[in-house]
Every structure is written in structure tokens, then in C-alpha cells.
Amino acid sequence: MASIIMTGRILCIKPLQSVVKSLRYATTASFSRTADAPEKKVAVIGTGVSGISALKNLTSPFGNIKPVAFERSASFGGHWSFTSNKTRDEFGYPPSSAIYCGLRTNLPRELMSFPGFEHDDNLPTFPKQSDIYEYLQRYVDYCDLEKYIKFNTIVTNAVPRSPGDAKTKWEVTYCDVSDPTKSSTEEFDAVIICNGNCVFPNVPPFPGIDAFQGRLLHSRDYRQAEEFKGQNVAVVGSSYSGKDVARQLSDFADKVYLTHIDEPIKTVYENGNVIEKNFGIREIKESSIVLENGKEVHLDAIVMCTGYKYQFPFLSEDIISIQNEHVTPLYKHVLHLDYNSLFVITLLRNVATYPISFNQARFARSVIDGTANLPSKAEMAEDIAREVKWRSENNMTGPMWHYMDTLQWNYDSHLADMGKFEPLSEMLQIYWNFVENHREKDFCNYWKYDYVMNGKKTIEAIKRDEHQEEEHLPYRLVV
């Protein structure tokens, strides 16, 4: 595959054979259908990775769609738009970003890019936060997307004009964050929700949690490990964020207690001051926690790495229901069962967010412009019921309702088949499987390697020169 470097942009140029393959999904009939159709106005709520994906697909030259994106903050990028602010901005809203200083990706750059727009080959396999944000900036500039975004604007309400009508239009009410008393309402043919899945922290109601006199925070408010120098800190939760925060704190804290209820982790923490406690928390006291095995651990601080909750404050509960972190009723986790004009591109966990959200947006676009081949409502309801049954039988409920991992590839193929576009490359799946295995075996060091794919569809991990990169940098977490 060839590439062209132009003013810092990497534009992927596909071979003719690949182009021909792509064109079989884009027939002359579909082009003419969208070109002749009346203009449709689509609201996009949020401009993180998913919102940028939506804007790119909605602005295809083959069609008459006018997108309007609403972004609460002053910049696009969501998580990747770093801010040192930990709690609230000047208008009382939480920051869009949960990223901390010096952060790196925990996925290779091949899984952190949009189709057809690659990262600079000079970057390490696991880039820094600043590299990722610069990539998003180049992409938005190259695709000329910023002109569609209303910054510092919050959506307060989205209601169907004709409740129960699958093709209803929507009334979207919004206001400037600086003056919520003055609002405006516009009508849209469709709404695509991209408000993120790492915005609203989940803090379990442990008995006695309000009695703790030390520092208690969620990982979303965590910024610098240096703040905990010489302290005894409990990190609650052992998913990506829990293990990473424990690793970073180990450079500064006296002792780090990694408490969780999962299987013992395989990672070896090099500093020797990370103490794993795979027991649940029975009680939190003024200066300690009591584990389920009865052991009491005295602490200065607690960092809750306990995930996030889904929330859609601009929708009524009769439109979107959230029960035990299961967002319903959605077909394929993206299309509302009752409204073919309402989409959610923000739910999936443990996926390659960039390419997956891009193809979710392509699917939404195909439904909006009428090129998608959708099942009947009854068939979609049956599909939802089958998946609920399967996930219930396989212990994938609660925070796992929208969890994908290796399921994401078949999921993407189904969307591509219905939307009549090309599914994601097999190469991405190879990268995914490799990094998942590498990360599990060596969580503290895997980011120090560069990945090189050879002609046999296998990947070689090559250790980077330690003098090329700063040591002990944290990396991006998929939650």
C-alpha cells in the first residue's frame, strides 16, 4: 500500500484492485438515489472520535446531508483534548478529557486511525496523547469538518416530532454553556449520539465511603502520580486503568494496594511496592479499608478505577432505557429499534474505537440515505433478544452488556453487509490479537516495542532504543 505525505498529512492511496473492491459496495444506483434525494439535516451530539467519524461520513460527496455537530467544550477530540482541570470547568461542567499527563496509547497506532488516513510512520507503535490529538487535528483539517461544529454548546433536549413513527424528525434544543437561560430549538431529520462512554464515573456505594477522611477520587480525576508521593494508596479495580494507575503510582507512592475481585493478574510490577489484594471491599473507614477476608489496610488515598456509567441526559427514559448498564432498545448497539432516525455511536467497550466507530457511522449514514438493507422491525427485535439471551448465558451482563473484544470483527461484518460497504481489514484483527496477548504477558513494558507486520500476516515486536523515549510514561486506556 502506497502513501503520500503532504504538509504533515498521511493520505493512504489504495491499489486499483482495492478501489474496485470498494466500489462494488457503492453502486451507481445508490449514488443516484442519494444525489436526487432532498437535503437531510442531521444532528451529531459530541465531537470526540465517534463524532468526528459521524461528521466525516455524513459529508460524503455522494448525497445531500447537512450535519450540525454540538460540542459542549471549546475543542473537538473528546478524551484526547487534554486538560489539567480535574473536576469542573468555569461553567460547572466536568472536563471532556479523562487523560492524564504524558499518556500513551495502549493500542498500536494501526488500531488508532481512521480508514484511509494513517499516522506518521516515524511515530512509535504506541504514540503519546499529544501525537493522537495532532492526528485528529490533521484529520479534521484535511476533511474540513470544523465548520460543522457548534462549540461551547450543550444539547438539553431531543424529542421526536412524531412519537412512534420510525422515520420521525427530531426537535433538538441547545444552548451556549455560558448562558443556559437562552436556548434554541432546531428540527433535524436524524440524530446521532456521540457523547462518549467515559464521561460519567461509576463509584460503587461501598459501606462507609462517606466516612473516609483521606483523598478519594475516581480515575477520571487522576492526573499526576507525583501528587501521591510517599503515601499508601488503594487502587480499586484491575481493568486497564486499574493496572496502569497502580503501575504509575508505584514510582512515587510508598505502597500501592491493587484491590479487585478478578483472577490474579499476570503482570509483575518492577518496583515491588504494588501489593495485590484480590478481595472485595467490605467496608471503608476514616483512614482504612476492610477487605472481604477481614484484613484492614490503612490508607492515605483511594483511587476508584471502577469504570463509567452510560447517561443521555437530553433524552427521556421512554426513548432510551438504561438498566444495569444495558442501553435499550438498540439494534446492533447502534440503531434504535423504534426510530430509524436515532443512532448511538458511543456504547461499545474494548474495541478498536477509531475504525469501529467509523464503520458504525457509515452504517448510520446508509440508513439515513436509504441505501442500507435493514431487516424488518420484528427481525431486529428477535436479533436483540437472541443477543440478550446469549450474553446472559455467558456472564456478559452489567458492564459487559456492550463489551466486544474479539466479537467486534463479526459485528463489523454484519454492519458492512447491511450498509453495503467494505468491512474492516483482516490486518486490524491481527494487530488486535497480537497486542492483547503481548499486553497481558508484559503490561509494564509492552509499550516499549514497535510492531512490524511481515508478508506472512504475522507481527514482530522490536524493542525500541530506550534513549529514544522517556521511561515510565503512562499510556492510553481502553475502558
Which stretches of residues belong to each language-model region?
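N-terminal Rossmann-like FAD-binding beta1-loop-alpha1 element of flavoenzymes
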Residues: E39-V68, V245-A246
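Short hydrophobic core segments
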Residues: I45, E186-C198, A234-V236, L299-G307
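Glycine-rich FAD pyrophosphate-binding loop
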Residues: T59-K86, Y257-P264
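Glycine-rich active-site loop/strand segments that organize a redox cofactor
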Residues: R72-R138, Y331-L337, E382-W401, D405
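Feature captures the FAD/FMN-dependent oxidoreductase FAD-binding
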Residues: E118, N122-A190, N195, V199
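Glycine-rich dinucleotide-binding loop and its adjacent helix/turn
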Residues: N122, K128-Y135, D141, S184, ...
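A Rossmann-like FAD-binding core segment of flavoenzymes
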Residues: T153, N157, D165, K169, ...
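C-terminal, flexible cofactor-proximal segment of oxidoreductases
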Residues: S341-V479
